[in-house]
Structure formats: C-alpha cells, structure tokens
C-alpha cells in the first residue's frame, strides 16, 4: 500500500542518522541491509525538499520509480544536448547562408594559383588564320535522283551548330560573335604559321596548314583545271627584306579574308625599347635607394610588346557589389600574404618570456592575472600578425579583433595596434568592443572615473567619447590621434593609393603612445585594489621597455606596406568587406615583444612577381569587360536582350577566374548587367560585329541547318529535283508565293493573314532565318507533316515554335530508292526556302596577306631587368634614416 507521509519527516531523519551510525560501527553488515540503507540515503537527501514524496513498502515499485527518474534525467540531458546541437546547427546554417552570398570559398592555394595562372593573351601563339568557312566537295544528282560521278565545291560553315531555343538562328550569330572575340588575335605574325606547299615547284610556302590542305585537295581533284594546278605549283611567299615585309598566298572565303585583313591592320603590338621597360617599373621602386636595378642589354629593333589595358574603376565593384568585392579583396589578400617577407632573427621566445617573468616578479606573486600576460606568445604568431596587418591593408580587407578582457597585456598591445593601423581597417563592432575594453580596464580606472556605459549604435566610438572627458593632456592627445587616424587617399601614377599618416611612417606616433602610457601608469587607480594597479603598471612597463623596438617595428611595417603598394595597379578602394580576417591581440603582443633588430624588405623578384600578377589580372579584367560589353550590345541588336543577359554576365565572371559564379546573388548579377550596359563598345569589337551583321545572309546560306524561310500550304506540293540533294522539299526561289516577314509576324502577333490565305488554299511563304530539322526517313516524315507544321500555325498561332522539315529522296536514302518508272510522286504540304550556298571559285578565293617578316613579342618585360638590394640592415625609409635604428 502506498500512502502520503506528511508529519513524520523528522522521525525518519533521526532513524536515518541512527542507521548511518550503525553502518559505520559495524562494517560487516550483509548486502541486503546495505541495499536498504542505500535506498534510505536517497530519501535523506530529499528531506528538506518541498515536494511531497510518495512512500511505498514495495521494493520493486521503489526500484522502478528510481529507474524512471534516472531515465527522465537522462532524457532531459539528451534534450539539452539536442537543443544545444540544434542551436549550434542553426548558427552553422545561418553562417552557411551568409557564405552562399559570397562567390568564392576555395582553399587559399587554389585562389593563389588561379591568380598566378592568368597570363597575358599574347602568350597564345596564333598557328592558323581565323576562319568561319571551309570549302567542301558535294555530289551532283541527276534528274532521276541518281548521284553523278562528278563533284562540285561549295563554301560551307566549319562549325555548323545551332543551340536549342526559340531564337536559334540569332543565338547562333551571338555565339559566333563570342567565338570571334575569343579567337581574335592581338597580333598576327604570318611567318610563324606558314607551312610548306607540297605541290610547289620551288619549296614555296603558303600562309597556314588549312590553306595547304585546301590546295592539296584541289590539286588531287580530277576535275581541277590544268591552269589551276599550274597556279598552285607557283604559289609561294614573296619577301621584301628591306621593308621587313613578307606576302603569303592564302585560300579564304571573302568574309574570312575581311576578318583576317582587319586583324592584320589593327594589331595591338607596339615597338619595345629599354626606356619603355624602365618606365614600366613602378616609379617608387625605381627611385627606392634600397633597390639596385640594371639593364645589361639592348633590345633589337624588331622587339614588340602589347601594352596592358589598365583602365580604372569601369564597373566600380566596390560600390554595392558586396559579394563580388569580398571575393576580389580575399584573392588580393591571399596574394599579398604570399609576398610579405617573413620576419627574421626574432627574439628567442623562451628568453623573452623568462625576462618578462623577471620584470613581473611572478615568483613572488600570489595573484594569477599577470601570468596571462605570457600566454600565446610565440614567434609563429608574431610573424603571422606582421603578414596579416600588411596584407589586409594592401587588399583593403576588414579585420576583426579577438581578445580576452582580463589579459591587460593584450589590451596594452591593442593600444599600439590602434595607434598604427587606421580605424577603417577594423569592423566597427570589433573596434568598439576593443576600445571599450581598453577604456573600462585601463584608462577610466586610472583616473578613478566610472565605467563607460556605451549605447550600441552610438555614432561616436568609445575613444571619441573618452577624448571629451579625459582631462590629462597626453592621454587626450593620444586619443585624438587614434580617433583621426585615417588613410590619406593619394593618386600616384594614376592609381588611387591609401597612404599612412607621416607620424606613423616615421614611428614618432609610438613616442606619443608611450607618453600616454606613462601618464596612465603614474595614476593612482583610486577605485581599484592595489593588485589591479600593479598589474596594469607592470603591463605598461613591459611595453615601454620595448620602446625602441616598437618604433622600429612601426617603421618596418609602414615601409613594407608602401613598397608593396607601389606594385598595385587597381585603385585601392576602401569599403568594409562582408567577411573579415581575424586578428588575435595575443599575436599582436607576440609581435611587440619578439620583434628583433633584423630588417626585412621584399626581394626584387618578389616585387616583380607581385607587380606582374596584378598587371595580368587587371588587364584580363578590362579585356573581359570589353568582351561582355560587346556581347551585350550584340545581343541587344539581335533582339536577344532579355533572354541572354544573365548568361552573358555569368560568362564574364567565369572568365575572371576567381569567382564561383553559382554563388553570386541574382541582384548583383542584374546590377552588374546595368553597369556593363552603360559602357561604350571598344572600336575593334564593334567593327567585327558589323562585319558579321553585314554578311549574315552569306553565313546562313553556308549552313546546313538554317533556312531562309518556309512555304506552307493546305494542298500537297510536289518535291522538286535539286542537284545538291536529289528530290527534296526545297524551294530555291519564292516566285509566285505570297510572302510574309517572320520577324514582323512575331513582333505584331497578327496571324489572321496567314490563316485566311491557307483557308483559301493559297500557299504562304514565311521569310526569315530559322532552323530546320533534316530527316532522311520518308515514312517518319509523312507521319508528322500536318501535325508539326500546319497545326501549330492555325491552332496555336505561334510562329516562333515552327520547325520546317527538310527531307531528301535520292539514291543514297536508307529506305527508299527513286527510279524513273515509279508512278508515285512524293509530295509535302511544306517546303523549305533555302538559298544556294556560294560556290567555291579558286581564283576569287586566292588572297595575298601581308605582315612583318619578323618581330618578337615579349610578354614579361621585367625579365630584362637585373635587380638586387642593399644589405637589409642598411635599408633606409622615406626620411633617409635607417628603417631599423635600434641596433
């Protein structure tokens, strides 16, 4: 029986105590009694509990109740763990959502490799002329559909591919234009691509391997006239050595000839001499006395180079493109870290920690706050901090600070950091947290002031508020400097540079910091215990003992930053980045405490490498902008504007190499499109598009997949004989047919005219470029004639889905052989209007192309410069004093 027990709690407690005493006296009690005692011990723990306990005399029930409670506890623990895991997972999900809005998340090595792999375009050697057309031999068919033994040469497209979609033919021309832009050479040297003419009498050469192959095929064709063979045998180059000019014979379609002639007339190569190379080196490095630059040879008169395209800020990616800007700054940061020199001859970590321990008199102390001063100090952290600071400034990448408020040494080191690095380099929340910690831990307690209660969202930073409240001149003066520590924007050699304050560059600001720290250490800390005051004073003492080294460190930091900054070619726009580089204040302490006397400056080879990578990326960036602007203009003029725009912008970003395009948010894609639309088209690219536009009909004729129109009728129309195909549903002219323009029809959407004519049994010719599907099976063709063509026109009234069908009936068909005595005449309710491609005429296709006989294009201009440095220990800063004075 179970009953409620309210009044006898004290009695139970006494009995419990007696039994516990008995247990202590007699340790040989049997296990049953021990079990009972164990159960009652649990009860004694709950004596003072306010909850009512249900006591039962049934041992089994007690055990079950205990197990239930135990399982409940375990369940609640598991629930807590699940909730905790869920919370952590939620944070990870939120972080992942943020990550997805930033286009690059790849290992650092791969980003660096992508940047270094961007080479100038002229490194691609042209081995062939640009061609859209090639001559092909096609059989001739007799009136009865049998193939003759004779062949005829026609100009056909080399790459006859049509993409899927409603605007197939227009997309074909857009893709063709993109292909031309990709293959458009910056220069052509015909001598490099010339090959031997096998049929030449005197080992002459023709312009490229394709010309040689065409000549060979024509020479071997039995129907070729003797005069043409003799002409091929005479084909060879003509050299005018005194003018450095050579003429090569070529076989080209007139349109291809126009393209290649344009490329030859508009080459981007310029003469190269020593002056150009020397002026190519950034002026600040040329004038830096620490670097000795020398050229030990003259360049020949045939030397050429392609001027890099270094236009600035055409898209302003720093403005309202947070994800794209984050990716660019990340890749710049990774590149910059790879070129910042490693610190040398740092103070031994062990020796420094031992010295700091002596200064702190740690053996005699009982408090532990000062032992924290020594945590995390190591040379790796010092070197990492040095690289992070310089690389973040070079890439204008925002940093966030990580620190522990109770580690006063970290906060004092943070005061040096905030003195030498402009405020803009830190994410605002992190900067506020660090400044607030310094004020409430060091500055306000020193003067006995109340803690600062900072309101989140206050436009002023804690240091700005403190500057108005602190009466001490030195401390207020230092706060004023930190509050106004901003980059100066200076345009040097046409590039916007973010320059440090002169007081930081020469290290004088460290003396200002030390004066403020000395004032703080002399204060009484009236509201704090003596131990607290002593800890702060000893932390300040540790830093002030390193005054000379800190001045040197500041000068070294500024010198390396400015020297590497001279190699940056894109404007250094400063915008806070979405992601940040974490900086531990303990690593700043490591840097302050372990910096030695050894000067480190970038090697000339490192500078040249950094400069080359920056130039190549910047030039590629501008060229890809030119391509994208040209394609957008072409899409607009081909009425593909709405459909193709996003893919054009995606292609543009892919070609910049560093972006993971699938992660770029759509809003930034369309904003990028709007910026690209405003830019003018580069003249070469515009001329090339106009060439394509003027010759669209010739290109359509040469295609086997593009028709110039379609004829539709209710009544059957007989197949006509065509000498190129045999019997086909092809019309070579539109005489006698009522014509309607397809483009106009799609624009107006008025199909009444077509349906009326068809219902009156009048064939209609819809004229305009559209693709057709070739099908040589007669049975499958007849089965789908009416359904595919007429139904779509009359019922769906959608001309843009029209697919005209070309089919052939000739002696080569798989399932049908047409002979003269067949009574059945094949018919069709649709005909394809297709103009005859241009016949290949050898005389009209032979062109002489002219180029320089020889010149050499150099892509790496700095390879000619031999460079060395003075002994780093003698290296001087901008003020003509040694960078490191504390020797």
Curated annotation (Swiss-Prot):
Residue segments, region Hydrophobic: 401-421, 429-449
Can you say where in the cell this protein is located?
A: Virion
Instruction: Summarize what the UniProt record says about post-translational modification.
Output: Sumoylated with SUMO1 and SUMO2. Sumoylation of viral proteins seems to have a positive role on viral replication.
Q: Where is this region: Disordered?
A: 1-43
Arranged from A to Z, the UniProt key words for this protein are: Capsid protein, Inner capsid protein, Repeat, RNA-binding, T=2 icosahedral capsid protein, Ubl conjugation, Virion
Q: Name one GO cellular component term.
A: viral nucleocapsid
Matching entries from InterPro entries are given as:
Rotavirus_VP2
Query: What quaternary arrangement does the UniProt entry report?
Result: Homodecamer; each decamer is made up of two conformers of VP2, called VP2A and VP2B. Interacts with a VP1-VP3 complex. Interacts with the intermediate capsid protein VP6. Interacts with NSP5. Interacts (via N-terminus) with NSP2.
**General function of this protein:** Inner capsid protein that self-assembles to form an icosahedral capsid with a T=2 symmetry, which consists of 120 copies of VP2, with channels at each of its five-fold vertices. This capsid constitutes the innermost concentric layer of the viral mature particle. It encapsidates the polymerase VP1, the capping enzyme VP3 and the genomic dsRNA, thereby defining the core.
* Stated name of the protein: Inner capsid protein VP2
Q: What is the source species?
A: Rotavirus A (strain RVA/Human/Japan/AU-1/1982/G3P3[9]) (RV-A)
């Amino acid at each position: 029986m179970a009953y409620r027990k309210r009044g006898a709690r004290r009695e139970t407690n006494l009995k419990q105590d007696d039994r516990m005493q008995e247990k202590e006296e007699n340790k040989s009690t049997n296990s049953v009694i021990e079990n009972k005692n164990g159960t009652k011990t649990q009860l004694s723990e709950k004596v003072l509990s306010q909850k009512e306990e249900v006591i039962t005399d049934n041992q089994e029930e007690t055990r079950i109740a205990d197990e239930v409670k135990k399982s409940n506890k375990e369940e609640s623990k598991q629930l807590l763990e699940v909730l905790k895991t869920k919370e952590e997972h939620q944070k990870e999900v939120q972080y992942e959502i943020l990550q997805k809005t930033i286009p690059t998340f790849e290992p650092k090595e791969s980003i660096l490799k992508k940047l270094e792999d961007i080479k100038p375009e002229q490194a691609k050697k042209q081995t062939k002329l640009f061609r859209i057309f090639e001559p092909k031999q096609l059989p001739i068919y007799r009136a009865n559909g049998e193939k003759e033994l004779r062949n005829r040469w026609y100009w056909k497209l080399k790459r006859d591919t049509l993409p899927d979609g409603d605007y197939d033919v227009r997309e074909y021309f857009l893709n063709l234009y993109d292909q031309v832009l990709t293959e458009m050479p910056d220069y052509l040297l015909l001598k490099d691509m010339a090959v031997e003419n096998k049929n030449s009498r005197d080992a002459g050469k023709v312009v490229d391997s394709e010309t040689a192959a065409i000549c060979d095929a024509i020479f071997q064709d039995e129907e070729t006239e003797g005069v043409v063979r003799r002409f091929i045998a005479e084909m060879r180059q003509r050299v005018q050595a005194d003018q450095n000019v050579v003429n090569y014979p070529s076989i080209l379609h007139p349109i291809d000839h126009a393209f290649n002639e344009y490329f030859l007339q508009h080459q981007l190569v310029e003469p190269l001499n020593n002056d150009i190379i020397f002026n190519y080196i950034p002026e600040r490095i040329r004038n830096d006395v620490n670097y000795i630059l020398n050229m030990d040879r003259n360049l020949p008169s045939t030397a050429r180079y392609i001027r890099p395209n270094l236009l600035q800020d055409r898209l302003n990616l720093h403005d309202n493109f947070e994800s794209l800007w984050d990716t660019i700054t990340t890749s710049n940061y990774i590149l910059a870290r790879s070129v910042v020199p490693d610190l040398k001859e740092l103070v031994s970590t062990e020796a420094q920690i031992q010295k700091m321990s002596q200064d702190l008199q740690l053996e005699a102390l009982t408090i532990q706050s000062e032992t924290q001063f020594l945590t995390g100090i190591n040379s790796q952290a010092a070197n990492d901090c040095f690289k992070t600071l310089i690389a973040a400034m070079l890439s204008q990448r925002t940093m966030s600070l990580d620190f522990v408020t109770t580690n006063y040494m970290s906060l004092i080191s943070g005061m040096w950091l905030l003195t030498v690095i402009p405020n803009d380099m830190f994410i605002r929340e992190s900067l506020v947290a660090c400044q607030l910690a310094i004020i409430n831990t060091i500055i306000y307690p020193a003067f006995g002031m109340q803690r600062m209660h900072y309101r989140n969202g206050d436009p002023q930073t804690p240091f700005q508020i403190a500057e108005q409240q602190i009466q001490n001149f030195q401390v207020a003066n230092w706060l004023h400097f930190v509050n106004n520590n901003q980059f100066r924007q200076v345009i040097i050699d046409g590039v916007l540079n973010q320059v440090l304050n002169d007081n930081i560059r020469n290290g004088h600001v460290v003396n200002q910091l030390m004066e403020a720290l000395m004032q703080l250490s002399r204060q009484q800390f009236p509201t704090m215990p003596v131990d607290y005051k002593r800890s702060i004073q000893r932390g300040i003492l540790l830093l002030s003992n390193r005054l000379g080294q800190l001045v040197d460190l500041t000068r070294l930091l500024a010198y390396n930053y400015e020297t590497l900054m001279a190699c940056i070619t894109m404007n250094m726009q400063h915008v806070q980045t979405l992601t940040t580089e974490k900086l531990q204040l303990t690593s700043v302490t490591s840097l302050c405490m372990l910096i030695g006397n050894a000067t480190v400056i970038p090697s000339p080879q490192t500078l040249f490498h950094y400069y080359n990578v920056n130039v190549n990326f910047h030039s590629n960036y501008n060229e890809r902008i030119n391509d994208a602007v040209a394609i957008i203009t072409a899409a607009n003029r081909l009425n593909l504007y709405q459909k193709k725009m996003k893919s054009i912008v995606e292609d543009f970003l892919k070609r910049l190499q560093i972006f993971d395009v699938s992660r770029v948010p759509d809003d930034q894609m369309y904003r990028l499109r709007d910026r690209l639309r405003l830019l003018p088209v580069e003249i070469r690219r515009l001329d090339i598009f106009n060439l394509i536009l003027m010759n669209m009909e010739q290109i359509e004729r040469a295609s086997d997949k593009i028709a110039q129109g379609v004829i539709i009728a209710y009544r059957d129309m007989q197949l006509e004989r065509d000498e190129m195909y045999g019997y086909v549903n092809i019309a070579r002219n539109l005489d006698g047919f009522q014509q309607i323009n397809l483009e106009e029809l799609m624009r107006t959407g008025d199909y009444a005219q077509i349906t009326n004519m068809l219902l009156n049994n009048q064939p209609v010719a819809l004229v305009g470029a559209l693709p057709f599907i070739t099908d040589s099976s007669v049975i499958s063709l007849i089965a789908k004639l009416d359904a595919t063509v007429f139904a779509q026109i009359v019922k769906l009234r959608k001309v843009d889905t029209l697919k005209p069908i070309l089919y052939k009936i000739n002696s080569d068909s798989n399932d049908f052989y047409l002979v003269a005595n067949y009574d059945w005449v094949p018919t069709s309710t649709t005909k394809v209007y297709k103009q005859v491609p241009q016949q290949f005429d050898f005389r009209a296709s032979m062109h002489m192309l002219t180029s320089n006989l020889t010149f050499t294009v150099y892509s790496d201009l700095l390879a000619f410069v031999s460079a060395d440095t003075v002994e780093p220990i003698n290296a001087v800063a901008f003020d003509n004093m040694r960078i490191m004075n504390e020797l």
